[in-house]
């Protein structure tokens, strides 16, 4: 460490380094060694929740805990402090005559943020707080910087996102939210595994973007001297596995899209995609509803949930409505009727629906009407199905009306949570759809993809009728933690 760096330190940091040096002089490693604890704060609080001060005195139970020193008070020969571990905090009561003079000095000189190991007797104070009466203190690790806003938690939004470690230390609500996120992902896996799905891994680096309509991140592979893209979906590789006979597969992983950022979008996000042979989009609706209701029940319990003051009846059967019917209900316009592109464009102009250059079919305009008028009305869980074929290049056409596909999206609180369909397994039709997407790309549609000839070739070997699904896990985490911004459910969101 240079003298220049030492001079830049503030007074608190200098004092902490002096204490670090003093520990070394005493033969104590400032950054500790392995420590065996017998209990966490949560285990102790649960085990002794119904024990009185007298009960604990009689049973003389001992415990060894470890964690970060969060508060400390007292002077002279007696001190109180709170130790924080992954499950919460527990108070320690330290007396000089119980731990000895030398050991008491370790406690006395410990700074907030230091890690301590505490061995002692479980007790309850006169105020009724469960505590550990220390018989020995072990220094485990020195914190060379003071914690932010000692008693009130970290509140600066920029710091919360840039320095998540400080947020987790200071804000228990934030810590618990990310524990819930992990539980959500674990329960998704549990549900999928119990329903016979096999978890697999597919490449993050692709030669061609595909499986979704999105702008990719482009990178360069130096060894092979080729440009590659970060995946915008896992779909096409997973469906190759269906061709290969795996029948039920899923992947939970990061997806990368080089697009805008807002309260519900981050350039990298987590999704689950799943594919089931011999199923159609109706089966996948049932699967989607099952996943979300299972996870919600496990994490939040039975009954509806509350999101930002609105009751969401996530425990009840989800509504199912065709896109054309949804548009008709809100606008009165009936797109079931056959009409020319010019007639549809006139209706769009009449209703002030923005039209893009690549909206070259009635299907594009139906989708634009839906996005303009319907999405913001979908509060309760709703499956919207029957998307136009032009905006669904990987979905199978509907047998009854081939203008539309056997596709659905799940909306809750006006946001899309899932996208799924009966997969297109006709390689000739698939090639035609890819070529239409390539044409749209040439007309300025940045989200359109090119032709994946390798995938078309895979389909030519035969893929069974298949249903597929994608769920945005980050949005589901937002819903189940009552959070309004995606950054609050991403440990390390993208920052400038």
From Swiss-Prot:
Transmembrane segments: none annotated. It is an enzyme of class 6 (ligase). InterPro entries: Aa-tRNA-synt_II, aa-tRNA-synth_II, aa-tRNA-synth_II/BPL/LPL, Lys-tRNA-ligase_II, Lys-tRNA-ligase_II_bac/euk, Lys-tRNA-ligase_II_N, Lys-tRNA-synth_II_C, NA-bd_OB-fold. One of its GO terms (biological process) is lysyl-tRNA aminoacylation. Signal peptide: none annotated. SUPFAM superfamilies: Class II aaRS and biotin synthetases, Nucleic acid-binding proteins. One of its GO terms (molecular function) is lysine-tRNA ligase activity. Keywords: Aminoacyl-tRNA synthetase, ATP-binding, Cytoplasm, Ligase, Magnesium, Metal-binding, Nucleotide-binding, Protein biosynthesis. CDD domains: LysRS_core (cd00775), LysRS_N (cd04322). It is found in: Cytoplasm. It catalyses: tRNA(Lys) + L-lysine + ATP = L-lysyl-tRNA(Lys) + AMP + diphosphate. NCBIfam families: lysS_bact, PRK00484.1. This is Lysine--tRNA ligase. It comes from Streptococcus agalactiae serotype V (strain ATCC BAA-611 / 2603 V/R).
């Amino acid at each position: 460490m240079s003298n220049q760096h030492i001079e830049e330190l503030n007074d608190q940091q200098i004092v902490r380094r002096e204490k670090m040096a003093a520990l070394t002089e005493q033969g104590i490693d400032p950054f500790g060694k392995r420590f065996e604890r017998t209990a966490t704060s949560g285990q102790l609080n649960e085990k002794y929740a119904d024990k009185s001060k007298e009960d604990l005195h009689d049973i003389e139970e001992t415990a060894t805990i470890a964690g970060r020193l969060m508060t400390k008070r007292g002077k002279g020969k007696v001190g109180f402090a709170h130790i924080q571990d992954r499950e919460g905090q527990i108070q320690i009561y330290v007396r000089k005559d119980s731990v000895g003079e030398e050991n008491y000095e370790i406690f006395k000189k410990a700074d907030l943020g230091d890690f301590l190991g505490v061995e002692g007797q479980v007790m309850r104070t006169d105020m009724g707080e469960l505590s550990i009466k220390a018989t020995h203190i072990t220094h485990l690790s020195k914190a060379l910087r003071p914690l932010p806003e000692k008693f009130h938690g970290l509140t600066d939004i920029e710091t919360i996102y840039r320095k998540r470690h400080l947020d987790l230390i200071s804000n228990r609500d934030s810590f618990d939210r990310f524990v819930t996120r992990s539980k959500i992902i674990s329960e998704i896996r549990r549900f999928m595994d119990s329903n016979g799905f096999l978890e697999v891994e597919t490449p993050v680096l692709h030669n061609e973007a595909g499986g979704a309509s999105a702008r990719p991140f482009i990178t360069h592979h130096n060894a092979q001297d080729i440009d590659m893209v970060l995946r915008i979906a896992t779909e096409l590789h997973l469906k190759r596995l269906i061709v290969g006979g795996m029948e039920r597969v899923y992947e939970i992983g990061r997806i990368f899209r080089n697009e805008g950022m807002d309260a519900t979008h981050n350039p990298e996000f987590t999704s689950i995609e799943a594919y089931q042979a011999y199923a159609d989009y109706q089966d996948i609706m049932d699967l989607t509803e099952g996943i979300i209701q299972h996870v919600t029940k496990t994490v939040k319990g039975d009954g509806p949930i509350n999101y930002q003051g609105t009751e969401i009846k996530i425990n009840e059967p989800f509504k199912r409505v065709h896109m054309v019917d949804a548009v008709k209900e809100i606008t009165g316009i009936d797109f079931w009727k056959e009409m020319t592109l010019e007639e549809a464009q006139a209706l769009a102009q009449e209703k002030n629906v923005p039209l893009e250059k690549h909206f070259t079919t009635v299907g594009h305009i139906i989708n634009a009407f839906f996005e303009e008028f319907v999405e913001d009305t979908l509060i309760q869980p709703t499956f919207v199905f029957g998307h136009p074929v032009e905006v669904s290049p990987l979905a199978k056409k509907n047998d009854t009306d081939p203008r539309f596909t056997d596709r659905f999206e799940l909306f809750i609180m006006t946001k899309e949570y899932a996208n799924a369909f009966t997969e297109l397994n006709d390689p000739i039709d698939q090639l035609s759809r890819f070529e239409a997407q390539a044409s749209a790309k040439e007309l300025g549609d940045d989200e359109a993809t090119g032709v994946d000839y390798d995938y078309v070739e895979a389909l030519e070997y035969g893929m069974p009728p298949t249903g597929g699904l994608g769920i945005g896990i980050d949005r589901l985490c937002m819903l189940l933690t009552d959070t309004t911004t995606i950054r609050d459910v991403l440990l390390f969101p993208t920052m400038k």
